Amino acid sequence: SKIALSKFKKEVQAVIIYVNAHYMDKLTLDSIADYVGLNREYLSRLFSKETGIGLFQYINGVRMKRAGEMIRSNKQVYVKEVAAAVGFDDPYFFSRKFKDFYGKTPSEYAEA
């Protein structure tokens, strides 16, 4: 579900838009803080306070939702391809995160 952007401060709105456009890239607290022009610690606190979740929890959620869509739309897709497409270098780490998020492995999710 989409977060209603207008209820957040403009810096948090900018982060949400940036993450949704760049979830496939290597995102770091420093790179995001530089993008919005804030100190990294302040950004981290502000994002958590405004949204109720941590920045990397949010990024992971965006990535997992996109991964789920990819798997649902192409059940033959390789885990390695999905992992890379949503910003994970390591398909095994991706699979663990996917299972944490969905309660199923990517292949179980594809079969469901």
Where in this protein do the model-derived segments appear?
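Core residues of bacterial helix-turn-helix
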Residues: V36, L43, V86-G87
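Membrane-proximal linker segments that couple transmembrane helices to downstream signaling/catalytic modules
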Residues: S1-L38, K49
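Residues within helix-turn-helix
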Residues: D30, E41, V77-E81, P91-Y92, ...
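Short helix/strand-capping hinge loops at secondary-structure junctions
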Residues: H22-L27, G54-L55, T105-P106
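…primarily DNA-binding HTH/wHTH and HhH modules…
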Residues: R96-A112
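Terminal helix-turn-helix DNA-binding modules in bacterial transcription factors
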Residues: I17, A21, K49-D89, E111-A112
